[in-house]
Every structure is written in structure tokens, then in C-alpha cells.
Amino acid sequence: MSRIPLGKVLLRNVIRHTDAHNKIQEESDMWKIRELEKQMEDAYRGTKRKMLPSSSSRMRSDGFDEESQRYYWRPKNEISGTLEDDFLKAKSWNKKFYDYEANMPDRWGHSGYKELYPEEFETDSDQQDITNGKKTSPQVKSSTHESRKHKKSKKSHKKKQKKRSHKKQKKSKKEATDITADSSSEFSEETGASGTRKGKQPHKRKKKSRKKSLKKPALFLEAESNTSHSDDSASSSSEESEERDTKKTKRKKREKKAHTSVANNEIQERTNKRTNWKVATDERSAESSEDD
């Protein structure tokens, strides 16, 4: 047998060693990728499992270091735990939110949006009821509500005007009564002063007892004259107001009669013109026929 040279043996050994090393490296890389995939699945599914690789699942070949592999997987496990916790918290909060939304009575529409756009929330049954007359549409309701408000505002405005006019009438009546009372008091004072002056001259020579007895009936007469004068002034003011009203009504009637008479005269003139025009045309036609 021929001997194999030493160089060729060394080359073969190097090739075998490199092949084995590459296989081991590829296998470790594949296991790393698989563990990362499992971590992602566990993070999204919320399952917990041990991430440290067991010694039985590893190939014990040349160049494999279990301690380095354990050191490599420690931070990965810590990161996966934090991710799982965050994912579980987010999932629980999402579940609570979904349950709250499912139990909401106004889930598919907002109340303010319903008020602004009620037509979009109407169903077929509501539309049928509206067409049959059982139900009123929201637009009709709003229009009726607005009309009622308008009517109420008109009524309140009329009531306010009536109250104001009534107050003005009361004020004018009070002013008239005050003026008449002042004038009657002034007139009574003047009459009383003149009466006392006249009564002093003939009674100078009489006794004091006579003067005292005469003072009381004089005051009583003055009060009676004042009351009678005030009554006369009030009655005279009421009579004056009635006379003014009657005068106004008479004037209005006269104006209406004059207007109607003028209108009747104009109508008669127009009719006369028309008849005269017809008569003139008839006469002209008769004259033309005679000439022929």
C-alpha cells in the first residue's frame, strides 16, 4: 500500500473540522431563531414557558459551550417577561373597554349627533308610522314647537301692551283728578277767605259766644262746598271726555261719507262717459247710413 503524504491528511482533517464547526454554528443559529419565534408567540398568546434550553435538547459536539449559551439567553428571558406583562395588561384593559362599549345603551350613536341628524337614526317602522299618521316626524315636532313659542310670544306681547295702556290710563286719570282737586281746593280757599271777610264786618259788635257758635257751621259749609265742587269737576271732566269721543266719531263719520260721495261721483262720471261714447258712436253710424 502506498503511504498518504502528510499534507493531504492535514488538509482532510481541516476540512472535516470546518464542516463540523459550520454544522454546529448553523444548528445553534437555527435554535436561536426558533427560540425567538417561540418568544414572540408566547408574548402575543400570553403563555409562559421556560426559555432556557435543556441540555438534552442540545447536541454535544466539539465546540459547544453550554455556559455561553445560558449567558446568551438570560437577557432574552427578561425582555420576554416584560413584554408578556405589558401584553397582558393591554389585553385586560381592552377587554374591559369592549365590555363597557357592549353594555352602553348609546353605543352606535351619540345623543348630540342624534339631535342634529335625527333622520339617520330613523328605522323603517318609524317611517311607516309617520306615513300612516301614528307618529310625527322630528321636523314637524320642531316646527310645531316653534309655532307654539311664536304664539306664546305674541300673546305675552299683547298682554304687556294692554297692561301698559291700562297703566297709562290710570296715570292720566290720577293726574286729572289731582288737577281738579288742586283747583277745587284753591277755589274753596278763595271762597272761604272772601266769605270770612264778608262775615267779619256785620258780626264785629256781637259777643264772643255768638262768634264761637257760628264758627262750626261755617267750617261745615266750606267742607260741603269743597266736596260738591270736586264732584262737579269730576263729572265735568267725564262729560268733556265723552263729548270729545262723540266729536271724534262724528268727524270720522263725516269723512267717510264725504269719501264715499266722492267715490260715487267718480263712478257716475265714468259710467256717463261710457254711455255718452256709445251714444255718440251710434249717432255717427246712423248719420253715415243716412248719407249713403
Swiss-Prot record:
Keyword annotations: Isopeptide bond, Phosphoprotein, Ubl conjugation
Compositionally biased tracts (Basic residues): 147-173, 197-215, 247-259
Keyword ATP-binding in record: no
Annotated crosslink Glycyl lysine isopeptide (Lys-Gly) (interchain with G-Cter in SUMO2) location: 8, 76
Pfam family, one: NKAP
Region (Disordered): 47-67, 122-292
Database matches in InterPro entries: Nkap_D1
Keyword Nuclease in record: no
Compositionally biased residues, Basic and acidic residues: 280-292
Residue stretches of biased makeup (Polar residues): 128-140, 180-194
Domain of life: Eukaryota
Single annotated GO MF: identical protein binding
PANTHER family: NKAP DOMAIN CONTAINING 1, NKAP DOMAIN-CONTAINING 1
This protein's name: Uncharacterized protein NKAPD1
Organism: Homo sapiens (Human)
Phylogenetic lineage: Eukaryota, Metazoa, Chordata, Craniata, Vertebrata
